[in-house]
Amino acid sequence: MDAVSSGTSQANRPRSNRGVGIVTAADSRERSLGQLHVYDGDGKGKSQAALGVVLRTIGLGICEQRRTRVLLLRFLKGPGRAYDEDAAIEALQQGFPHLIDQVRTGRGDYFSVDEVTRFDRQEAQRGWDIAKGAIASALYSVVVLDELNPVLDLGLLETEDVIRSLKSRPEGMEIIV
């Protein structure tokens, strides 16, 4: 029987670690911070999932005056190409410049392993150097490394270096790959 039909309210129901339902940030007594989110697979949705966390973090910074700041580092999404989410990100940056930074690296077109150039390697390294600095600085509460998995698949960065840096992130920092 669910809470409505049994006459008990959600507040009076015993809480368990398992089950079905939605616990909002307002309902949660403890926020789980410092997670490593990995979104992978074919098709759309990975970047949008990361942007949902970005939006939540910015909302916390606005509403609760928490010390939050987001780095949105977008590998393989150079300035030569427009993306659907660009206008929303730019609006957030204009409205709340103290809460979000964005860096785009790479060229604007798709390429395969056979088409990797020196520029691609330099841009991937430039982005990774920024990411490592952001992680080490502890300035950000959330660091999004959009398209990092394809960068690794293309062999543009050393996987072990990436893993080492992700493992050494400050306590409480969320990283989204």
Predicted regions span which residues?
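ASCE RecA-like P-loop NTPase motor cores
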Residues: 12-13, 35, 164, 174-176
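Short secondary-structure boundary/capping segments
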Residues: 28-29, 90, 167
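Short gly/ser/thr-rich secondary-structure transition/capping motifs
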Residues: 19-22, 124-129, 176-177
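Phosphate-binding/switch loop-helix module in NTP-utilizing enzymes
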Residues: 111-171
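General beta-strand structural signal in soluble alpha/beta enzymes
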Residues: 102-104, 145, 177
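Generic beta-sheet signal
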Residues: 35-39, 70, 141-145, 173-175
